[in-house]
Structures are given as structure tokens and as C-alpha cells.
């Protein structure tokens, strides 16, 4: 997660995750940056950047927000209803 990355809708996030599976990637790792961002060592290893918000959130809260968005992404992929 990176403040300078693209912000996306739930549908776009779902498509991003779906495309990773289509490309044969069975594991996705999410890295949540701290208030000072990410180290260069982490940045060099990234494949894609996502920004959820320009606001700062506590890590515990953001982990739940990320989990909810991943859940929502899979609901969208299966064309199942989800709360908007």
C-alpha cells in the first residue's frame, strides 16, 4: 500500500486480484506502509502499488479494511451481491 499509488474502486481492486490469478499467481502479498512509507528494499520488490486513501489509519484498523476489500473482491468476482 503506497500513498503515491493509484486509488481504485472495489470493482477495479477485484479485477486486479482476478488478473493475478489469470496470470498464474496463486499468492498475493500485501505490504502496509508505515507513516514514513516503505523502505527502498521493499519498493524494489513490489509488482504493483495500491493506495486505499490519502488518510492515515492505525495498522490494526487498516488490516481489517484490507481484509474486507479482499472479501468484497471475491464476492464481485463471483457476481455475488455485496453491501455498497
From Swiss-Prot:
Pfam families: SPOUT_MTase. Its EC number is 2.1.1.177. GO terms for molecular function: methyltransferase activity. It catalyses: pseudouridine(1915) in 23S rRNA + S-adenosyl-L-methionine = N(3)-methylpseudouridine(1915) in 23S rRNA + S-adenosyl-L-homocysteine + H(+). The keyword rRNA processing applies. It is found in: Cytoplasm. SUPFAM superfamilies: alpha/beta knot. InterPro entries: Alpha/beta_knot_MTases (IPR029028), RlmH-like (IPR003742), tRNA_m1G_MTases_N (IPR029026). GO terms for cellular component: cytoplasm. S-adenosyl-L-methionine binds at residues 33, 52-57. Keywords: Cytoplasm, Methyltransferase, rRNA processing, S-adenosyl-L-methionine, Transferase. One of its GO terms (biological process) is rRNA processing. Its main location: cytoplasm. Belongs to the RNA methyltransferase RlmH family. Specifically methylates the pseudouridine at position 1915 (m3Psi1915) in 23S rRNA. Homodimer. This is Putative ribosomal RNA large subunit methyltransferase H 2. It comes from Clostridium perfringens (strain SM101 / Type A). The gene is rlmH2.
Amino acid at each position: 500500500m503506497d500513498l503515491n499509488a493509484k486509488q481504485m474502486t472495489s470493482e477495479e481492486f477485484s479485477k486486479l486480484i482476478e488478473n493475478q490469478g489469470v496470470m498464474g499467481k496463486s499468492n498475493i502479498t500485501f505490504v502496509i506502509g508505515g507513516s514514513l512509507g516503505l523502505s527502498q528494499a521493499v519498493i524494489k520488490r513490489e509488482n504493483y502499488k495500491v493506495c486505499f486513501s490519502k488518510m492515515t489509519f492505525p495498522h490494526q484498523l487498516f488490516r481489517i479494511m484490507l481484509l474486507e476489500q479482499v472479501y468484497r473482491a471475491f464476492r464481485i468476482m463471483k457476481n455475488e451481491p455485496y453491501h455498497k
